[in-house]
Design a protein with these regions (language model features):
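Solvent-exposed loop/turn segments at secondary-structure junctions
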Residues: 45-46, 74, 81-85, 96-99, ...
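N-terminal capping segment at the start of a domain
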Residues: 22-55, 110, 184-187, 270-277
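Alpha-helical metal-binding/catalytic segments enriched in His/Glu/Asp
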Residues: 105, 109-158, 296
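Metal-dependent peptidase/peptidase-like ectodomains
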Residues: 151-254
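His/Asp/Glu-rich mid-to-C-terminal helical/loop segments that flank catalytic regions of hydrolases
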Residues: 255-306
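Flexible, small-residue-rich helix->loop connector segments that border functional cores
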Residues: 96, 131-145, 169, 301-302, ...
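Secretory targeting and sorting signals
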Residues: 1-21
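A non-catalytic alpha/beta surface segment that caps or lines the substrate-entry region
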Residues: 37, 41-95
Length: 306
């Protein structure tokens, strides 16, 4: 418990959530799964995918946006053009907290054309959405300003996130104090990876430590991984913004030592359906989805000073 909350408790004062330091919430994984089922339904209704330039991507954006709008977020859709098609980033601001200290969290909402992209990256997208909705439900009044991004055209080379960062003035970049990325969190043969801060902007080590502490609080061992230019934090890192993230693994195979530590199958890919048609709502390990999503909440509540 944070000191303020403890003091108020012992002095017998009644306190509202807006005044107390909130413990990080336990995000109900069933709510995250419900979002994934919607993304699967959207893919089914739109030719089997949610890819850039295809109607399933825009329908995904509209689904997430409607939930956020109803919860009180200030949302906007930023458009860009790539490969002759319009792309979409969805940006959502929780309209409270010090605007000169912005904490950002994001992930990509587009899939590859081969399949519905439920683990890659419905999982991170749905987890971020449910954490955002939890902030609204709890009516959190954070010290810092919270902003979410759901990026388009990641699968074509980090296009949407790069477009967003390039669209910011240097003043707008300098107020962003952290960016945390969630791309693949429900891998069927899961790992519990935290992005390595090595080679990342100064300030990234604190984010790495925080994400590790979030898993440690749940008794889950972690490993560091160097994601490099393989996901959307890269554009933020290039702009000098401290970054981090979590990841449950893609095409690489789980080692025997990792299977000892995390369970699952040794010598099998973390996600055998990576970028395949079989990346459906059946391609999700619910325990992994639950743990990674709870860590999103743990890290964000701490970073924003909730
Ligand atoms: N960027 C992911 C993809 O969309 O294909 C895969 C990935 C995520 C790879 C994180 C490494 C680390
Ligand atoms: Ca949970
Ligand atoms: Zn991908």
């Amino acid at each position: 418990m944070k000191l303020l909350a403890a003091l108020l408790l012992v002095t017998g004062l009644t306190i509202s959530p807006a005044q107390a330091a909130l413990a990080a919430p336990d995000i109900p994984v069933a709510n995250v799964q419900a979002h994934l089922n919607e993304l699967q339904r959207i893919a089914n209704a739109n030719g089997g995918n949610r890819a850039h330039g295809r109607p399933g991507h825009k329908a995904s954006v509209d689904y997430v946006k409607a939930k956020l709008d109803a919860a009180g977020y200030q949302t906007r859709i930023q458009t860009f053009t790539n490969s002759g098609a319009t792309g979409y980033n969805l940006i959502a601001d929780w309209p409270f907290g010090d605007a000169s200290q912005v904490i950002m969290a994001g992930g990509h909402l587009d899939s590859v054309t081969r399949g519905p992209g439920i683990n890659d990256n419905g999982s991170g997208s749905a987890g971020l959405l449910e954490v955002a909705l939890t902030v609204a439900r709890q009516n959190v009044r954070p010290a810092k300003h919270l902003r979410f991004g759901w990026w388009g055209a990641e699968e074509l080379g980090l296009v949407g996130s790069t477009f967003y960062v390039n669209s910011l003035t240097s003043a707008q970049k300098s107020v962003i104090k952290a960016y945390v990325n969630f791309d693949m969190t429900g891998s069927p043969n899961p790992g519990y990876f935290v992005y390595s801060s090595s080679g990342q902007p100064s300030g990234s080590l604190a984010i790495e430590d925080l994400l590790e502490a979030g898993f440690a609080a749940k008794g889950v061992p972690t490993e560091l991984t160097s994601v490099g230019g393989r996901s959307d934090h890269a554009a933020f890192a290039r702009a000098g913004i401290p970054t981090g993230g979590t990841f449950s693994g893609a095409e690489v195979r789980k080692t025997a030592a990792q299977a000892q530590k995390w369970g699952g199958q040794a010598n099998v890919a973390f996600d055998r359906c990576y970028h395949q048609a079989c990346d459906t709502s059946g391609n999700i390990n619910v325990t992994s989805l639950d743990r990674h999503t709870d860590v999103i909440a743990y890290a964000l509540y701490s970073l924003i000073g909730a």
